[in-house]
Amino acid sequence: MKYPKKVKTFCRYCGKHTLHEVERVSKGKASSLNWINRQKKRRGKVGNLGKFSKVPGGDKPTKRVNIRFRCTECKKAHHRPTWRAKRFELIER
């Protein structure tokens, strides 16, 4: 999917429509001290004595696009609900 690098949209901090710069946000480094990681580690030690096979699953074929809109006037940034796309690139318009 192609998306413009600059978009005129509403800034919730200025309270008006301004030009926003769009930037792609990468996922931060996961902390091993999070509660969910400790829970997964505990769950790994519990078995079912070989009675059932594992449920098939894995990664989805597409990832959610994370983009940040930064206002050119007040320099504050905000996010929007994301969508799924296989390819995502920012283009000049």
From Swiss-Prot:
Keyword set for this entry?
Metal-binding, Ribonucleoprotein, Ribosomal protein, RNA-binding, rRNA-binding, Zinc, Zinc-finger
List, alphabetically, the GO terms of the cellular component aspect: ribonucleoprotein complex; ribosome
Q: Which Pfam families match?
A: Ribosomal_L44
TM spans, by residue? none
Q: Which GO terms describe its molecular function?
A: large ribosomal subunit rRNA binding; structural constituent of ribosome; zinc ion binding
* Keyword DNA repair applies: no
- Describe how the cofactor binds: Binds 1 zinc ion per subunit.
The cofactor(s) it depends on are: Zn(2+)
Q: Does the keyword RNA-binding apply?
A: yes
- Residues holding Zn(2+): 11, 14, 71, 74
- GO BP: translation
Q: Where are the zinc fingers (C4-type)?
A: 11-74
Fetch the InterPro entries from UniProt.
Answer: Ribosomal_eL44 (IPR000552), Ribosomal_LSU_eL42 (IPR053708), Ribosomal_zn-bd (IPR011332)
What's the domain of life for this entry? Archaea
Enumerate the NCBIfam families for this protein. PRK05767.1 (NF004425)
> What family is this?
Belongs to the eukaryotic ribosomal protein eL42 family.
The annotated subunit structure for this chain is: Part of the 50S ribosomal subunit.
Q: What does this protein do?
A: Binds to the 23S rRNA.
- What name goes with this protein? Large ribosomal subunit protein eL42
Tell me what organism the protein belongs to: Archaeoglobus fulgidus (strain ATCC 49558 / DSM 4304 / JCM 9628 / NBRC 100126 / VC-16)
User: What taxonomic lineage is listed for the species of origin?
Assistant: Archaea, Methanobacteriati, Methanobacteriota, Archaeoglobi, Archaeoglobales
Q: Which gene encodes it?
A: rpl44e
